UniProtKB/Swiss-Prot annotation:
CDD domains with a match to the protein in the record: Ribosomal_L30
GO CC entries: cytosolic large ribosomal subunit
Gene name, Swiss-Prot/TrEMBL: rpmD
UniProt KW keywords: Ribonucleoprotein, Ribosomal protein
Lineage: superkingdom: Bacteria
One matching Pfam family: Ribosomal_L30
Gene3D superfamilies: Ribosomal protein L30, ferredoxin-like fold domain
Descriptive protein name: Large ribosomal subunit protein uL30
Coiled coil: none
Similarity comment: family membership: Belongs to the universal ribosomal protein uL30 family.
One GO term (biological process): translation
Length: 60
């Protein structure tokens, strides 16, 4: 079974490039301090890597 990751948006997307905004939205994060739980897949890990400066990640 794949590991679960708890992803929290900790910094605002205001003033960020459109591709970073789209990545945050694709992760399912809408507002500041919102949290989602996702499975650890290569696609999700790539998205996390792209916006790592805006989010915090913990194992769920």
């Amino acid at each position: 079974m794949a590991k679960k990751l708890e992803i929290t948006l900790t910094r605002s997307v205001i003033g960020r490039p459109q591709d970073q905004r789209a990545t945050v939205e694709a992760l399912g994060l809408k507002k500041l301090n919102s949290t989602v739980v996702k499975e650890e897949t290569p696609a999700i890990l790539g998205m996390i890597n792209k916006v790592s400066h805006l989010i915090t990640v913990k194992e769920a």
